[in-house]
Amino acid sequence: MLSIKNLQAKVEEKDILKGLSLEIKPGEVHAIMGPNGAGKSTLGNVLSGREGYEVTGGEVSFDGKNILEMDTEERAREGLFLAFQYPVEIPGVSNLEFLKASVDAVRAHRGEEPMDSVTFLKLAREKCKAVNLDQNFLKRGVNEGFSGGEKKRNEIMQMMLLQPKLCILDETDSGLDIDALQVVAEGVNSQRDPNRSFIVVTHYQRLLDYIVPDFVHVLADGKIVKSGGKELALELEEKGYGWIEKAISEEKGA
């Protein structure tokens, strides 16, 4: 589904990703962990095509297509979804309008007719309930005046409606209490599917108690330096990232 080979990228002339490679098959959940500044959020932003990130080398293939040549909207229509660490507000545009337009754009890309408004409203209300959001949130501006937890739940609701092929969750657990974390995780787990894959970016292991990954990767100094199963996340929780950073430092000094 997703093939990343030797990906290199920079932000404001600073090299962040320095030869990252990763293969993700349909139905797999991959957790990306690492210290602050390792490039975790940069990876998600580069994959989604966010402005301000310059790819300087490498290849990224999504379902056999080179997504680096696509703009952000085209990548979304192809089935790539990014849940931001800090979801943005869009004042003046209701959640319902935004979601309907997004879903219809994806449907049009697939050659399908727009969903009629009555059917969509019923579906949106169902998804609101699934992530424990009041239906009044559909009338409000996108993320406008939402708490941190409400923004995260709103993004999971978007994911449920859009039905993407690849979901990138960028520190979705950031700032969430345990109850909100469980609601978000349940929403994510309900979308696990043999044809849908996830990249779960997190700094802490606790999210992975609820969204259990197939693979865990440690990102440090712009590339994946260690991979394993769920036990690797537990090791990181116990030891921290110091041992990883020390190994990298010794390797550079060798």
Give each language-model segment a name.
Residues 2-4, 17-19:
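Conserved structural motif at the start of ABC-family nucleotide-binding domains
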Residues 14-15, 74, 182:
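Short coil-to-beta microelement around the adenine-binding A-loop and adjacent beta1/P-loop entry
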Residues 168-172, 179:
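Walker B catalytic motif
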Residues 33-35:
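The feature captures the beta-strand-to-loop junction immediately N-terminal to the Walker
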Residues 59-75, 143:
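ABC ATPase NBD Q-loop/coupling interface
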Residues 215, 219, 223-246:
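Conserved beta-strand-loop-alpha-helix hinge in the C-terminal portion
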Residues 88-165:
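ABC-family P-loop ATPase nucleotide-binding domains
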